[in-house]
């Protein structure tokens, strides 16, 4: 008898078919406090990381950009001035609650032109080959069940000469800081999650998912195996997060 394929959900092993639902439950729970969560996880640094991420994207006026796991709208809001009136940004997210929060937030800011929102699975993108000049994914890849499949899809929908960028928590490069980082991730963060959002378990999963995510070298190799060329890595904040960039040639 064939065994049911499994994957990780934080430190738990779960059936592959269940992970998307479990991750969806987490993000539906934290959707309206997602910025607060990111501030707690990064001491507010996520705002600077996102600015740097978009600054290194190479996006130009007239480009068509796909922002995956972009439901909060943070990256889209930064991309819109870069694509200009002739360009466009498609925000894709598998979680409808996240999309609603992000769409409402950007509507309140009057950001409408050149922006569209769509619920989609990063492992099966609903676009033709070579549709986008750039694909971005910030703090989303670690929650994908089959990361290699998502990377291959990102490569598929890129135009020749296009680039994909992944911003994600990664492996700390300064080992002396690891005990303090672990204390914050596994003890402080879940307790704050319980006090602020009444949801300790979701915040515990998010901390665990960071540790289970591939390190810098492993993710770079995965991108190369998915077809990307000229893959480079930039560590931010001593490797707490990293930007991976690859090109379709």
Residue map of PLM features:
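N-terminal auxiliary segments of SAM/dcSAM-dependent transferases
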Residues: 1-25
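C-terminal alpha-helical "lid/dimerization" subdomain adjacent to the S-adenosyl-L-methionine
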Residues: 18, 167-222, 226, 232
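Conserved alpha-helix/loop element of class I SAM-dependent methyltransferases that forms part
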Residues: 29, 33-36, 40-63, 78
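Hydrophobic beta-strand segment of the Class I
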Residues: 34, 135-136
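Class I SAM-dependent methyltransferase SAM/SAH-binding core
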Residues: 64-124
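A short acidic, Gly/Pro-enriched loop at the edge of an enzyme's catalytic core
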Residues: 123-134
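A short glycine-rich, Lys/Arg-flanked "PGG" loop and its adjoining helix->strand segment in the class I
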Residues: 148-163
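Core SAM-dependent methyltransferase catalytic element
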Residues: 226-249
């Amino acid at each position: 008898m064939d065994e049911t394929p499994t994957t990780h959900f934080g430190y738990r092993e779960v059936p592959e078919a269940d992970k998307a639902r479990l991750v969806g439950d987490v993000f539906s729970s934290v959707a309206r406090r997602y910025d607060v969560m990111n501030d707690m996880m990064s001491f507010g640094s996520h705002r600077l990381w996102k600015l740097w991420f978009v600054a290194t994207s190479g996006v130009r006026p007239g480009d068509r950009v796909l922002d995956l796991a972009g439901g909060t709208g943070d990256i889209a809001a930064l991309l819109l001035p870069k694509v200009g009136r002739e360009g466009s940004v498609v925000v894709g997210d598998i979680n409808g609650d996240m999309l609603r929060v992000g769409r409402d937030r950007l509507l309140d800011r009057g950001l409408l032109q050149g922006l569209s929102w769509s619920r989609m699975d990063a492992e099966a993108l609903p676009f033709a080959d070579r549709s986008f000049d750039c694909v971005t994914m910030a703090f989303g890849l670690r929650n994908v069940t089959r990361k290699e499949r998502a990377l291959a899809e990102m490569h598929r929908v890129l135009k020749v000469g296009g680039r994909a960028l992944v911003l994600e928590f990664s492996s700390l490069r300064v080992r002396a800081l690891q005990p303090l980082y672990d204390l914050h991730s596994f003890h402080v963060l879940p307790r704050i999650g319980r006090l602020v959002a009444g949801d300790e378990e979701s915040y515990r999963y998010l901390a665990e998912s960071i540790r289970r995510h591939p390190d810098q070298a492993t993710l770079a190799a995965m991108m190369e195996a998915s077809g990307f060329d000229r893959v480079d890595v930039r560590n931010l904040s001593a490797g707490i997060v990293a930007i991976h960039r690859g090109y379709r040639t």
